[in-house]
Amino acid sequence: MSNVKVAFICAHNSCRSQIAEAFGRHLASDVFQSYSAGTETKPQINQDAVRIMKELYNIDMEADGQFSKLVSDIPEPDIAISMGG
């Protein structure tokens, strides 16, 4: 696994950034470590995103331990990518 840390950042860390983290973990874990976070959190990640990722890509974000986090909750990234907002 690479030591490069990539963080996907959006407002609530409930949908876009969670999807990006999941794809990063499943498709590029040999290239970088994926994280996601937001400037605010939600009680749970978007259930439509969870369902679609599971149905279309067989990626279970909740079983993989993903949850809504603040930027201060993750390691300092080498690369931060804003997911809009």
Question: Where are these predicted regions, by residue range?
Answer:
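Short polar/charged helix/loop
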Residues: M1-G85
